[in-house]
Each structure stands twice: as C-alpha cells, then as structure tokens.
C-alpha cells in the first residue's frame, strides 16, 4: 500500500472544506427561518447545566471512538496507549470534516504509520473498525425495531411507512460489507468479479491495489476475529457509543419539554434515523442526518419542535465535536513529534 494512502489534510483543502461547511450551515439555517422564533424560544428555556450535559454526551462519541481504536490497534501494537487511541479518534473526526467525508481513514493512517503500524495492517484495522461500527448500528436498530415494532406500526403514517424498505436496503449493504471481511467465499467471489475489469493499464493497476487491500483485510479480520474477548470489548464500546448518541435527542426533547415520547421510543427513532441516513448522500457528515431526522421525528413532533431538537442535537453531536476534534488533531500532531515508533507485536 502506497504512502500516499496516509496523509494529513493540506491547509488549502482545510480552508475550502471549512468554507463549504459554512455554506451548508447557512443553507440549513435558511431552511429553518420560518420557525426561528420557535427555535430560539425552545433553546432559551435551557439552563447552563442542561446545555453542558447535552454537550458532554455529544463529546462522549468521539472519545469512545478513540477507545475503540485503542482496543483494535493493540491487537497489532500491544504498547499502543489509550492516549494514542484518543488521538486516532480525533484525527478521524477532524479528517472526515475537513476533507468533506473523504479523508478520515487517510488521516488516521498517517498517525498510525508514524506510531509504528505499517500502512497495510493499519488500513485493514481501520476498515474493520468501520465494519464493527456498521454492524453495531444494524444490531442496535434491529433489536429496537423488534422490541417496539407494534408501537411503531401503530404510529407511523405517510413516508414513514417506507422505513422497512430503507431498513432492508441498508441492512443488505452492511451484511455484504461484513461478509466481505469475514467470509473466504465472498472474498473469493470479489476477486473473481475484479477479473472482469477493463484490461487497460489504469484499471489493472486499480485491480492490483484492490486485490492487495482485500488480502490485507482478510488477514487482519482473521487475526482480530480469532481474539473473541477483544471483539466483545469492541462491540460493547460501539454499543455504548451509540447509546450515548441516541440519548441526545431524548435529552433535548425533555429539557425543552416538547414531547410525550418515552426514553426507549426515542432510542428506537434515533437508531432508525441513523440507519436511514446511511442510505442518503452527505457532504462532510451534513445533509443526510438532517434529512433523516426531519423524516423520522417529523411524525411525532410539530415542525417547529423537531427543528428545535435537531438544532440542539447537531450543535452537540457535530459542531462542538468538530471544534473539539480540531484541538484534538493538533494535540495529536504534537504527540507524534514526541513519540518513538514501537515495534509491531
């Protein structure tokens, strides 16, 4: 795997990305303009402690992502520290935004490579972290759906009736991704399909790169999945991360005094919202969440109410997290200059 696969975001790309982020934010604010009075009234009800509680829960997400990275990377580098895992989490969050969704893994690989992990295994482990995340999203939404399917069926109308179809499509994609990592049969099928690519030099180079990545992914997945206790820790941390994220809308709703929805109903709706957002296009993590949130919660809250909750939810889960990740990213760069790469275990 080439060194170009691991890189830091350039200043020019970062500035462009921040301008795009600002433009998208302005568009979202403009779409809320008809309900701005309701939104400001709802936000004004919050106490300082309530705001701090919501922000703290939002920040738990990247911190737990860092813990997941720490547990996964220690399968290769036993000396890998928790602080370094948190650095990887911040690098991923920062890289995802400043490269408009394209650079989370390359930025993480840059850090891991400097920390002593070869690019191939690093890419394999970060891909597996993504697969663990998607698998947990699927399992979480499935459990919530099975436990509350009757309530959901009795309270959904309009476009919400298409949720099962969206669920099925995203579930198929996630299952296929998981099988690509863990099933030798599916990996063999993928190699066979790559043989049908055009015989030009450009496509054959891509084929060689993809085959190399597939081989590394298979090796790392077999190595990691053989360590059952580690896999259970990863799933537990992923589930805890999602649980905190799904608590956010409930806290927003309760603190604003908006809805009779109970805790587990909000857990279900938020898990479905995240699930549906995976099927929608996004730029730097924006667009898909907002659309899915309005779609899912719009059936249970008034328009002004759902926009108020969405505003606070995104401030806590996106904007504050991104601001914190910018600080975390630059701290991670300082850590890199202070460390000596450990030997691979």
PLM regions with names:
Residues 1-41, 92-204, 282, 286-345:
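Transmembrane helix-loop-helix hairpins in multi-pass inner-membrane proteins
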Residues 64-94, 252-269:
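Membrane-embedded helical hairpins/re-entrant loop segments and their flanking transmembrane helices
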Residues 29, 40, 69, 73-77, ...:
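Membrane-water interface at transmembrane helix exits
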Residues 10-11, 47-49, 78-87, 117-119, ...:
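Membrane-helix interface segments
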Residues 37-45, 213-226:
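A short amphipathic helical element positioned immediately N-terminal to and/or at the very start
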Residues 13-16, 45-53, 222-236:
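Membrane-interface helix starts
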Residues 51-55, 82, 86, 123, ...:
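Hydrophobic alpha-helical transmembrane segments
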Residues 221-272, 280:
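Transmembrane helical segments that form the transport core of multi-pass membrane transport proteins
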């Amino acid at each position: 795997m080439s060194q170009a696969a691991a890189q830091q975001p350039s200043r020019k790309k970062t500035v462009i990305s921040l301008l795009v982020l600002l433009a998208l934010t302005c568009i979202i604010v403009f779409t809320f303009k008809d309900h701005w009075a309701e939104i400001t009234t709802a936000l004004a009800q919050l106490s300082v402690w309530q705001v701090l509680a919501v922000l703290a829960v939002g920040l738990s997400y990247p911190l737990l992502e860092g813990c997941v990275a720490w547990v996964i990377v220690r399968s290769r580098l036993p000396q890998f520290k928790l602080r370094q895992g948190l650095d990887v989490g911040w690098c991923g969050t920062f890289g995802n935004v400043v490269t408009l969704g394209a650079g989370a893994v390359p930025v993480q690989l840059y850090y891991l490579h400097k920390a002593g992990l070869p690019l191939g295994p690093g890419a394999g482990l970060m891909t597996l972290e993504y697969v663990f995340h998607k698998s947990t999203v699927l399992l979480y939404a499935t459990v919530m759906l099975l436990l509350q399917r009757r309530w959901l069926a009795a309270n959904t109308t309009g476009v919400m009736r298409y949720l099962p179809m969206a669920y099925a499509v995203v579930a198929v994609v996630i299952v296929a991704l998981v099988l690509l990592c863990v099933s030798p049969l599916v990996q063999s099928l993928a190699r066979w399909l790559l043989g049908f690519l055009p015989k030009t030099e450009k496509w054959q180079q891509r084929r060689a790169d993809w085959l190399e990545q597939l081989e590394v992914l298979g090796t790392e997945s077999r190595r990691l999945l053989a360590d059952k206790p580690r896999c259970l820790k990863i799933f537990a941390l992923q589930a805890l991360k999602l649980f905190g994220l799904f608590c956010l809308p409930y806290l927003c709703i309760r603190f604003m005094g908006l809805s009779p929805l109970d805790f587990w109903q909000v857990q279900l709706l938020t898990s479905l919202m995240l699930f549906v957002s995976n099927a929608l296009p996004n730029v730097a993590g924006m667009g898909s969440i907002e659309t899915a949130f309005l779609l899912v919660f719009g059936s249970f809250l008034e328009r002004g109410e759902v926009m108020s909750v969405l505003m606070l939810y995104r401030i806590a889960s996106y904007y504050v997290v991104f601001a914190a990740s910018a600080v975390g990213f630059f701290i991670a760069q300082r850590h890199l200059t202070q460390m000596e790469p450990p030997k691979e275990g």
